[in-house]
Regions:
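Terminal, basic amphipathic appendages of nucleotide-handling enzymes
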Residues: 1-153, 159
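Intrinsically disordered, low-complexity basic tails and flexible linkers associated
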Residues: 22, 656, 667-669
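Short, conserved charged micro-motifs
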Residues: 27-31, 582-587, 634-644
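Solvent-exposed, membrane-proximal periplasmic/extracellular interface segments of envelope transport
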Residues: 55-67, 612-614, 619-631
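Long, charged, helix-prone linker segments
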Residues: 102-106, 660-668
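Inter-lobe coupling/hinge segments of SF2-like helicase ATPases
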Residues: 130, 148-231, 235-576, 581-586, ...
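A common structural junction motif
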Residues: 593-602, 644-657
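Short beta-strand elements
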Residues: 599-614, 655-664
């Protein structure tokens, strides 16, 4: 008889600990077993975290396991990463385990599901690498052959050939007997990148992992990967948890995108997880972007990442010309429409040449909020507290947080007035206006309302790629890595949407969005044109984006960050407290603040801010309050340790308040 410590598959903070069981079966760390649990001895799944342990209680009272799952098991590396995630993010063991395990049932023999079964493979042979690509690969190959863990940041302008560098690196890694993970920021991009990879490496070597797969598809892909049948995994951020062994490289394309930071529990950063896993395998991390995050670029300047620059587009295709349009002048001239005169005239010319147009607005819906003109009341979701967005097609107010729809009242619920009006502009309104201007043209829209699943996304992208759609209107989905050859014009309908967000990253996000969407123009050999409309066209985020000058933007932004002591010069830790009782949430947040102040080292320079109500709380009669800690570099782990200690106190006190840690959140409002 030997003894093992397991984590029970029971989603409760009060059972989030090790339980000791005995067994005479062949059980090892990472196995999934069935165990009798609690007084009723109900059979529960459990995960073996430690084997061959010395029991801390009388062996006579220790229960024995019932069985071992013959198909699914985790590796030592996965278990170790789960333990690290629990400490890092203040989550339950089970929260981390669920990231690594499949959620579904096996297919019947011979009926495995392939999420990319229709992919024929897009073969793109590069005749000759550019000198910049060749230099990049020489630098990366040295790390691959050296078998040491290293980190690279590829700063390459749009269409500079970063994907070819990725694929040749992966080929090198696979030739050395290791495996690879290729991540993209949006599920919408997996189809295009999968086609290219199948064309290069063959379907049998590729697996796909993302949250839009069915449970059966995800299970079957997980099993193929775990059995070693796939050497390359492609996916969105979920792919970083692929059950690969001997990982040689993890690549994050468009590394600056906020989607690499999970906004659900566990609130992990994909880069953090990648680095943790690669340390175990001595693999390399590659981050690629035309607009690297300020944090990543600063790490490159500090020597934490090796910087590789691709300054020229492949085949020396010129970068598109960017024009800034002052919408204040349009108003003075009497133009109150969505299109400036310049955007309209250029749209006509582009369509006459037989080229396509992309119109970008990072707001979906028809109108962005519904308000009473009499008293100013803004209609909000009764469950989430988020202002409702009007969707004309559905004639409803929609909460973009929980997805629920509500009939728009005829009278104001606050004052009884009939003056209910719709304000702001979303992609649905842009589509309607564009159809009025160009009724004979084929117009498509790509946002979360028109593309609710991977199949719909692929259909819209394919239609535009094949030239069946003349004008594509979209949110940030159209700005991320899509490669269209016949786009002659990109119009940014309003650059002020992201610029006016009350967040310290707003200028960075604006620069990135404008630069990335501009990169969709002129990829087929001809110089494209980008028209950016704004009421603040002199903002440095827009002027530097118009000049394709990342370095100037970075130099200006990093000075502001340093002066304001924002990341990368500090770390932000947001601690959320959620409860059905609002007073309990407030009180617990206040107690945490007081606890951290008592733990605080004199002179460490940390700021611990008072509890605030989150504007994004989800769930009926559920309240979320948070405290924010801004701590100097080097003190982050200390404060995470103290926060976890406070969480243990809550468990001991049987508190009903749930606590979550969010390290360097992408939004603090």
């Amino acid at each position: 008889m030997k003894y093992i410590n397991v984590v029970i598959d029971n989603n409760s903070r009060h059972t989030d600990t090790y339980y000791t069981y005995g067994t005479s079966l062949d059980v090892k760390k990472g196995d999934i077993v069935k165990v009798p649990f609690n007084r009723g001895n109900k059979l529960k799944s459990a995960y073996v975290f430690q084997d061959d342990v010395v029991p801390e209680c009388d062996p006579a009272i220790i229960k024995e396991i019932e069985s071992v799952d013959p198909d699914i098991s985790l590796t030592d590396e996965m278990i170790d990463t789960c333990i690290w995630m629990k400490r890092r993010y203040g989550i339950k063991y089970l929260d981390a385990i669920k990231c690594f395990t499949p959620n579904g049932k096996p297919a019947k023999e011979g009926r495995e599901k392939e999420p990319y079964k229709d992919a024929a493979g897009e073969i793109q042979n590069i005749e000759q690498l550019t000198p910049e690509q060749e230099a990049a690969l020489i630098q990366i190959r040295a790390a691959v052959k050296g078998g040491r863990q290293e980190n690279f940041l590829i700063h390459g302008v749009t269409s500079s050939g970063k994907t070819e560098v990725y694929m040749q690196t992966i080929a090198e890694v696979i030739a050395g007997g290791k495996t690879a993970i290729m991540l993209v920021p949006e599920i919408a991009l997996t189809k295009q990148i999968t086609d290219r990879f199948i064309g290069r490496f063959g379907k049998e070597n590729i697996a796909v992992l993302h949250s839009k797969l069915t449970k059966r598809e995800r299970f079957d892909e997980w099993m193929r990967i775990r059995r070693g049948q796939a050497k390359i995994v492609i996916g969105a951020r979920l792919g970083v948890f692929a059950p690969l062994d001997k990982i040689g490289v993890i690549i994050l394309d468009e590394e600056h995108e906020a989607t690499y930071k999970s906004d659900m529990t566990p609130k992990y950063d994909t880069v953090d997880i990648a680095l943790k896993r690669l340390l175990h395998f001595d693999g390399i991390l590659i981050l690629g972007s035309a607009t690297p995050s300020v944090v990543s670029y600063q790490r490159a300047r500090e020597g934490i990442y090796q910087l590789i620059e691709l300054k020229q587009r492949y085949n020396n295709t010129p970068l598109p010309k960017v024009e800034l349009i002052d919408m204040r002048e349009e108003l003075k001239a009497g133009n109150r429409t969505i299109f400036s005169d310049r955007l309209y005239r250029q749209s006509v010319e582009t369509l006459e040449r037989g080229q396509q147009i992309i119109l970008f607005l990072n707001r979906r819906g028809y109108s962005t909020f519904i308000s009473c003109r009499e008293c100013g009341e803004v209609l909000k979701c009764p469950e989430c507290g988020i202002s409702l967005t009007y969707h004309k097609r559905e004639n409803a107010g929609v909460c973009h947080y929980c997805g629920k729809k509500f009939r728009v009242p005829e009278t104001c619920p606050a004052c009884g007035s009939h003056y209910i009006k719709y304000f702001g502009t979303g992609t649905e309104k842009v589509e309607e206006f564009t159809r009025e201007l160009f009724p004979e043209k084929s117009i498509g829209r790509l946002d979360l309302d028109t593309a609710k699943n991977n199949r719909e996304i692929s259909k819209i992208i394919s239609s535009f790629s094949k030239g069946k759609t003349d004008i594509l209107i979209g949110t940030q989905l159209v700005a991320k890595g899509l490669d269209f050859k016949n786009v002659g014009l990109v119009g940014v309908v309003s650059a002020d949407v992201s610029l006016n967000v009350p967040d310290y990253r707003s200028t960075e996000r604006t620069f990135q969005l404008v630069t990335q969407v501009a990169g969709r123009a002129g990829r087929g050999g001809e110089k494209g044109l980008v028209i950016v409309q704004s009421y603040t066209p002199d903002n440095f985020a827009l002027t530097t984006a118009a000049n394709h000058d990342y370095n100037q933007f970075f130099d200006m932004e990093i000075k502001i960050r340093e002066f304001m002591d924002y990341p990368p010069f500090s770390d932000l830790i947001l601690v959320e407290f959620t409860s059905e009782n609002e007073w309990e949430a407030i009180e617990t947040a206040e107690k945490c603040k007081e606890y951290l102040i008592r733990c605080k080292i004199e002179g460490d320079g940390a700021n611990i801010f008072a509890p605030r109500l989150s504007t994004n709380f989800k769930g009926k009669e559920s309240f979320r309050y948070y405290i924010l800690i801004k701590c100097p570099k080097g003190f982050r782990n200390k404060y995470i340790y103290y926060i976890n200690a406070f969480g243990e106190l809550l468990t001991e006190q049987n508190s009903k308040c749930n606590m979550i840690i969010d390290v360097n959140p992408y939004s603090t409002f």
